[in-house]
Regions:
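Basic amphipathic alpha-helical segments that dock to polyanions
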Residues: 71, 75-78
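Amphipathic alpha-helical dimerization/coiled-coil segments
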Residues: 2-17, 105-129
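Basic, amphipathic "hinge/linker" alpha-helix immediately C-terminal to the N-terminal HTH DNA-binding motif
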Residues: 90-114
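N-terminal helix-turn-helix DNA-binding core of bacterial DNA-binding proteins
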Residues: 21-70, 94-97, 128
Length: 129
């Protein structure tokens, strides 16, 4: 089934572009996966969580250049999409941890393959630029 991901985009729900994206996501696994993964910083966050449970502060320090607002938004997006789990310990000071969900764990080996592919193809494509 199609998730709300594309409907949250800037496209009007009755626009041709929206309907095309929705149809593609409903019928193509790659397109569906990419709607979940597309967005600046999402892959970086998932990669950190692939390594293990992380807290907001450590992710903020480790992901160079990400703003607090963007990290907060992307964590919410990934949680809403079911790729990560947020655990709030309800303590003072606040303690919140993030980890991959079952769906996120299934993505973990694919992230490794994407990383390997990127490392392999980058020098080839960079020569062509």
């Amino acid at each position: 089934m199609f998730t709300k991901k594309i409907s949250c985009s800037m496209l009007k729900s009755n626009s041709t572009n929206f309907l095309n994206e929705k149809a593609l996501a409903e019928h193509c696994g790659v397109t569906y996966a990419m709607t979940l993964l597309t967005g600046r910083w999402k892959i970086n966050i998932l990669w950190m969580l692939k390594i293990g449970v992380n807290r907001y502060g450590s992710m903020k320090r480790e992901i160079a250049g990400i703003s607090e607002k963007m990290l907060t938004q992307r964590l919410k997006d990934l949680e809403e999409d079911g790729l990560i789990i947020r655990k709030d310990y309800k303590t003072i000071p606040p303690r919140v941890e993030y980890r991959l969900s079952e769906a996120g764990e299934k993505l973990s080996p694919i992230l490794g393959l994407l990383s390997d592919w990127g490392d392999t193809i980058r020098p080839i494509l960079d020569k062509n630029v």
